[in-house]
Structure formats: structure tokens, C-alpha cells
Amino acid sequence: ASALAAAGACLAAGMFTVLHHPVPGPRVSNLAAARLAGPVAAPSPATGSAPAAAADPRKGVAAWNFTGARKALRLSGASWFYTWAAGPNGISAPPGARFVPMIWGSGSVTSANLAEAQRHGHILLGFNEPDMASQSNLSPSAALSLWPKLQATGMQLGSPAVAFGADQPGGWLDRFMKGAHRRGYRVNFITLHWYGGDFRTAAAVRELKSYLQAVWQRYRKPIWLTEYALTDFGASPARYPTWSQQAAFVTASTAMLERLPYLRRYAWFALPSNSTDGTVGLYRSGARATAAGSAFRLAPGR
């Protein structure tokens, strides 16, 4: 399916930020649509010649296949990537970048997918935005009923990645984590998404840090931030910062994330870019860096 066709299926999958709490709103971006669409073909213009960045242990990207994906991964300095699936969806990882599998939703909990995930290491990401009707759309109790199958893989498990409100008492993640504790289920780390609608660099970095800190204080478990960027999904259509604003946020947020001892990994949303998706993508077809991509490549590591 094309990204445009899949965009309708992903309507309302995003959020914007008020203070440090992401709030749901309509996500219409083609980038977000790829979480359901899978690999996206693209034309192949001339490529740039920027040197590859040194891979950072925490730095990662959310990705789907496109022309130049392998080269873009290498140039970005990402040490890991995921595709919202149990397998890499045709992306060939360059040296220094490892694929991390995900079990996306209830329909993904199959013997074949679990076996595929086990072939890709010892870490498994849980369900994608189960609190959103347009994403995996699972109640906490439904997710808990499936969790033993993920646990049986013996892999390190990331919690379901809620779209918003991970720090809220009585929220989706809070109910899931309490249920897991009562049942004696294993959750090794918390997985989060965050999108900011305040495009001022310092304010956005503060909001993201505040959200992460609140989630850490609630669960006291390591955190993986597996989607983040500046995008106001509360606007219709979605509102994006300028390239320079997005690039400034990439630089400042990465520096902040690298200083958080409980933040084990982070993944920018997303590796690919096209003309209809605002300023969030890092690389255009052919591995040509955007302003955000150049900033991500140069962002300091530990």
C-alpha cells in the first residue's frame, strides 16, 4: 500500500504537547502512516558524500525501507533501528547498526513473528500505541492476556509504547504496569513516544525532559524513547516547525537525552523524508540528508 493510502488508516495516531504531557490529536503525516504501510518505494536521485558518523550506543531511528536506507542508516550514526515489525522489512543494516524487533499488536502475536523476533537478538519492543484506536488499539487487559507469549521468548521486553500520558495515574500504561505486577509478569523497560507542539528549542527540550523524568519517577525502570520529534498533531492539518527549528531541537534534545542516566535508548521519528511530511524526516531518497538529518548525524554522543 502507498503511504498516502495508509495515512487514512493512521488518522488520529499522534499527539501534541501541553506542558510535558502529550495529548492525542489527529496524525495525518505520511511518515506516521508507514507504521502500517510497511516498506515504501522511492525514486533514486544522486546521493551526497557526507562521511558516516560514529555510531552512538543510544542513538536510533524509526525506519521503513526506501532508496538509500542502508546508506542513510550508516551516515546517521544510529546504532539501532526498528520498523514496527518483527523483521527489518528489507532494510539491510550497515555495520554498527542493529535491528530491534517489535510485536506491533494482537494480530502480530503469532509463532512465526515471535520466532522471527528471536532471530534478531535479545530485545523485543511491545505493542505500538495500544491507547490509540488507529494503532494497535488494545485495552490493558487485552495486552496483559497476550503478554505471556512475548515473555515466553525469553527476550528483554519493552512495555507497550503509549502515545501519551505514560506518567498519569490511572492511564493506559499505569493500568498495564499494575496488572503486570499483580500477575508477576516481566517488563524490563518502559517504551515511550513524544511529540512537541511548542517549537521553541529550550521550551521543547524542557517539556520532553520533564515528561521523561515524570515517567521515571513513576515506574523506576529504564526508558526507551522510540518516537520523538517536533510536530503539532493538534492542528489540522498537522503543523511543523521550520527546518532550522527542527534541526536546533535535534541538537539540543540529543544533548539532553545523552545526559539522562535512566534513558537507555532513543529513536528519532523518522529516518526517511518526503515533500509531504513536514520537517521530521532525516534523509530523502538516495540518502540525501535534510537539515534535521545533518543535525542528527552531527549530534554529540556520550
Show which residues each predicted segment covers:
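Aromatic- and acid-rich polysaccharide-binding/catalytic face
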Residues: T83, N128, L173-A214, R218-A235, ...
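Active-site clefts of carbohydrate-active enzymes
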Residues: G158-V162, A166, Y219-A248, F269-R284
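Alpha-helical scaffolding within the catalytic cores
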Residues: F66-G68, F81-G90, G105-A117, S141-S145, ...
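N-terminal carbohydrate-binding/catalytic regions of secreted carbohydrate-active enzymes
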Residues: A55-L125, D131-S141
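Structural recognition of the beta-strand scaffold that forms the well-ordered cores
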Residues: R58-A63, S79-W84, R98-I103, H122-F127, ...
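Aromatic-rich peripheral "rim/lid" segments of glycoside hydrolase catalytic domains that contact
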Residues: G8, F16, I91-A93, R98-G105, ...
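N-terminal low-complexity, Pro/Thr-rich disordered segments
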Residues: M15-P57, R302
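Secretory targeting and sorting signals
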Residues: A1-H20
